[in-house]
Amino acid sequence: MMYHIPGVLSPQDVARFREQLEQAEWVDGRVTTGAQGAQVKNNQQVDTRSTLYAALQNEVLNAVNQHALFFAAALPRTLSTPLFNRYQNNETYGFHVDGAVRSHPQNGWMRTDLSATLFLSDPQSYDGGELVVNDTFGQHRVKLPAGDLVLYPSSSLHCVTPVTRGVRVASFIWIQSMIRDDKKRAMLFELDKNIQNIQSLKSRYGENEEILSLLNLYHNLLREWSEI
């Protein structure tokens, strides 16, 4: 399943990120991909050896970790170190699948269950640059407001179309979820949303056994399916 997570960064945060990224050192994006991906990848990434990169990636991690909707949809166990990319002058990234595992600075290795793109450019400021994701439900073309994030299975074929005007800047992350199976994770997310909707009526109708029963079901399923 694909999920739109709005407002991960505020407009003020986005403006500050963009100002700082203007000062960043950019390198060939192929430095972080394998041989197959390098054949279709043509973009730039912030140099991960820079002091600025260390500060920015920490801010992205803090933002996503504090976002309740992101947590509910992803149920993250491990987050990769965020990276930042830039597309301009017809740069693109052809169809590819993300690697199944990635190195992680604390855990050694992590499994990539989910991929996330956090948009940092106003969609009106550039042409092209859509994230195109193919999954079992068809093809999705994504171009979100700055500060919003899209979450999708890492097993999906996806690409970024050529940027023909302006500049597209984004951060991207991989997530190892506590729930490996996409279908089970989606069911838990739907159950969680329904529980939240019912709980919003609690002030009017008070606590009831139905809410407690659903909460019990959610946590028992999470306990049964999670890998910690």
From Swiss-Prot:
This is PKHD-type hydroxylase YbiX. Keywords: Dioxygenase, Iron, Metal-binding, Oxidoreductase, Vitamin C. Residues 78-177 form the Fe2OG dioxygenase domain. Fe cation binds at residues 96, 98, 158. The keyword Protein biosynthesis does not apply. 2-oxoglutarate binds at residue 168. GO terms for molecular function: 2-oxoglutarate-dependent dioxygenase activity; iron ion binding; L-ascorbic acid binding. It comes from Escherichia coli O157:H7. One of its GO terms (biological process) is intracellular iron ion homeostasis. It holds the Pfam family 2OG-FeII_Oxy_3.
